[in-house]
Amino acid sequence: MNFLWKGRRFLIAGILPTFEGAADEIVDKENKTYKAFLASKPPEETGLERLKQMFTIDEFGSISSELNSVYQAGFLGFLIGAIYGGVTQSRVAYMNFMENNQATAFKSHFDAKKKLQDQFTVNFAKGGFKWGWRVGLFTTSYFGIITCMSVYRGKSSIYEYLAAGSITGSLYKVSLGLRGMAAGGIIGGFLGGVAGVTSLLLMKASGTSMEEVRYWQYKWRLDRDENIQQAFKKLTEDENPELFKAHDEKTSEHVSLDTIK
């Protein structure tokens, strides 16, 4: 048992990136970026202040790392839902087209393919939109509730996942009445609890915490902004073509028309 506890990092080596050093050395406390991250947080802030800070845009026009994670989860959910809905709906459209047009006389082979392609594309778009916004709204609500509760409490636990799963499941089945909402809440709470236990176990096994995850998000944002600034700087330096640069080097001496008579 002791061997498994000491080798807990190897249990998720294929899932999470590895770090050198002990678990408490993953984030260097003397790092300038970490100090700047701590300096941006008030020393004694309430839950409402943390929640307000989450929805505040900084001076550079960037959203908070917590809100950015909710946005990424919602977009990923929309993308997965759109792909799933598009594939399933287009497959149904293909089968219906083949069954309903077995005796149809088309002008040519290309005309049949064109109509099949049109119906395939339209149904793919319909299915993608139908499932995309639903899954996107579900994942955005789920991760949004988890993040808001975690930010308000200042820590992460299983309760956020249970509450988020129950609330989201109930709202998803609101069209079925109270019984549907109750069933959706129970199923959502169960699935949310499973997801919460899995996430917390992964963080514990890797020796990380939610604060460290937010720190790395903060650091990656700084690195991204710095790379963008360097790219713009290089772009402005390369605006002059090589021909103009060569001309400027050859005519670096001051040329005047005063000597011409």
From Swiss-Prot:
Protein location: Membrane
Gene Ontology terms: cellular component: membrane; mitochondrion
Transmembrane segments annotated in the record for this chain: 67-87, 131-151, 183-203
Subunit structure comment from the entry: Associates with complex I assembly intermediates during its biogenesis in a NdufAF3 and NdufAF4 dependent manner.
Keywords: Membrane, Transmembrane, Transmembrane helix
Topology class, membrane: Multi-pass membrane protein
InterPro entries in the record: TIMMDC1 (IPR055299)
Descriptive protein name: Complex I assembly factor TIMMDC1, mitochondrial
Predominant location category: membrane
GO biological process: mitochondrial respiratory chain complex I assembly
Role of this protein: Chaperone protein involved in the assembly of the mitochondrial NADH:ubiquinone oxidoreductase complex (complex I). Essential for viability.
Stated family: Belongs to the Tim17/Tim22/Tim23 family.
